[in-house]
């Protein structure tokens, strides 16, 4: 099969990767911070880099036509059957286990769905979990991101006796119609038709 299109997340720093289109998602809630690069700030590229790509504002309240936000779906049980999903109780105590770059966003997501009784357990971005990281003194469930769930699933398969519930909060990127229109226009200019 011939590939017509490759989409790379976090591909801006992969300079060897040839590209024709660059979209830069700018979190309007965080802004540009102190405008310094890692490790002094949280930027991966200088601010000037914004002028080289298409900037998509990430905020539900954005006034830019090129915007997106994350829509939260119902949590699902990572280590159980699908019929157990109805057992999710947002009023119980949770351990929020998270290994992402900006864990506060996950905590805000939990609060946005009415979940406020959670204890934060943060790990570095792209963390490789050990089963000991999921051991706590009581039997309260864990709640985590889909990104972390991808790393936790193989670990759970290695430890089939692990019986603490792990709930996953899925989010879906919702792009404005202007984003889809621009993408169609940019791809058409490259001779790629996705319709």
Predicted regions and their residues:
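Short, acidic/turn-prone active-site loops that include or flank metal/cofactor-
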Residues: 28-31, 71-72, 122-128, 169-175
């Amino acid at each position: 099969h011939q590939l017509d299109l490759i989409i790379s997340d976090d591909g801006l720093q992969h300079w060897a990767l040839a590209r024709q289109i660059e979209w830069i998602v700018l979190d309007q809630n965080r802004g540009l911070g102190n405008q310094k690069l890692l490790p002094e700030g949280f930027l991966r590229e200088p601010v000037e880099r914004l002028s080289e790509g298409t900037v998509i504002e990430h905020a539900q309240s954005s006034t830019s036509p090129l915007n997106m936000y994350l829509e939260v779906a119902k949590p699902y049980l990572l280590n159980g059957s699908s019929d157990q999903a109805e057992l999710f109780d947002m009023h119980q105590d949770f351990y929020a286990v998270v290994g992402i770059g900006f864990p506060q966003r996950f905590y805000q997501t939990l609060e946005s769905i009415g979940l406020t009784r959670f204890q934060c357990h943060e790990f570095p971005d792209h963390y490789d979990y050990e089963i000991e990281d999921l051991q706590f003194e009581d039997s309260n469930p864990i709640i985590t991101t889909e990104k972390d769930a991808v790393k936790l699933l193989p670990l759970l398969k290695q430890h089939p006796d692990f019986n603490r519930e792990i709930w996953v909060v899925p989010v879906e990127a919702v792009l404005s119609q202007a984003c889809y229109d621009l993408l169609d226009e940019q791809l058409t200019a490259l001779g790629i038709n996705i319709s």
